[in-house]
Amino acid sequence: MKNIGININTDKDISRNILDKIFQYIHEECSEAKIKVFYDSKGLDNEESRALDAVMVLGGDGTILGTARALAKYDVPIFGINRGHLGFLAEIELEDCKEAIKNLFKGQYKIEDRIMLKCDLKGIDKKDDFLALNDIVLTKGNLSRIVKYSIYVDDVWYTTFVADGVIVATPTGSTAYSLSAGGPIVYPDLDVLEIAPICPHSLGIRPILLNGNSKINIRVLKKYEDPVLTIDGQRYKKVTVNEVTISKSKYKCRLIKFKDKDYFKILRTKISYRSRECEGE
């Protein structure tokens, strides 16, 4: 492992001193390492990124999401040094950075392949893949009015309802927006997709889990303005068509996980309780 990328979120508190320390830690493990620094993911999706052996992300979970979309087609593994709020995906804290880099070069890690989503808009040029690691969300526009949606799974009608919107989430995204919409937490290596309605006008409309190979077709039956498509809470597009199709992408996000990191411990401390870890209690 000699070609290392570092993607920095410039909105976070990342001083030159921090970056110099990271350079030092890398060169202590591999004096011949070549380091390429990216700022706010600019240039990260270029073909040259294919040569990178790994990318370190300095930011929060949102920076991880952007990095994952940029690198998905290049099969480059990533890991995050948390400089954000939650740090669920960017799980390495700054004080543990040196140890993480040491383990990286010693090969003391595993790679988790996470499902990603793709979205096709009926009648729209497919040059934009609309990849997502967490979720793809279809919602009403700015007006405070609900929208009528009809959902088909593998070309079979599932249900029709009125709501503020619809979330289609991956297992990775199950701890994000869909969790707030009442969806379940899904273990990250399961091959499933989740549909979670947002504020449905019916007590009988609940989130559902589907086989990961399912094709989900969402049709907008009644609208007062063009609905909005949101990718990972970061990309935004007004939808002028009445139909979108969401399915599993052929690309995956490759997350580097170090052996001392326990998913359930992270879940307890950062999602379930957000409090002091009490081992065994």
Swiss-Prot record:
Which reactions appear under catalytic activity for this entry?
Answer: NAD(+) + ATP = ADP + NADP(+) + H(+)
GO aspect biological process, one term: NAD metabolic process
Q: Which Pfam families match?
A: NAD_kinase (PF01513), NAD_kinase_C (PF20143)
Subcellular location(s) per record? Cytoplasm
Q: Which cofactor does it need?
A: a divalent metal cation
Residues binding NAD(+), per UniProt: D61, G62, N134, D135, R145, D164, T175, A176, Y177, S178, L179, S180, Q234
Enzyme Commission designation: 2.7.1.23
Write the record's keywords in alphabetical order, separated by commas.
Answer: ATP-binding, Cytoplasm, Kinase, NAD, NADP, Nucleotide-binding, Transferase
Catalytic residues of the enzyme: D61
Among InterPro entries, the record links this protein to: ATP-NAD_kinase_N (IPR017438), ATP-NAD_kinase_PpnK-typ_C (IPR017437), NAD/diacylglycerol_kinase_sf (IPR016064), NADK (IPR002504)
Gene3D superfamilies (UniProt xref) = Probable inorganic polyphosphate/atp-NAD kinase, domain 1, Probable inorganic polyphosphate/atp-NAD kinase, domain 2
Q: What class of enzyme is it?
A: transferase
What is the protein's major site of localization?
cytoplasm
A GO molecular-function descriptor = NAD binding
Cellular component (GO) terms are: cytoplasm
Any idea what job this protein has? Involved in the regulation of the intracellular balance of NAD and NADP, and is a key enzyme in the biosynthesis of NADP. Catalyzes specifically the phosphorylation on 2'-hydroxyl of the adenosine moiety of NAD to yield NADP.
Q: What HAMAP family does UniProt report for this protein, alphabetically?
A: NAD_kinase (MF_00361)
Checking PANTHER family in the record gives:
NAD KINASE (PTHR20275:SF0)
Q: Which family does it belong to?
A: Belongs to the NAD kinase family.
What protein name applies here? NAD kinase
- Species of provenance: Clostridium botulinum (strain Kyoto / Type A2)
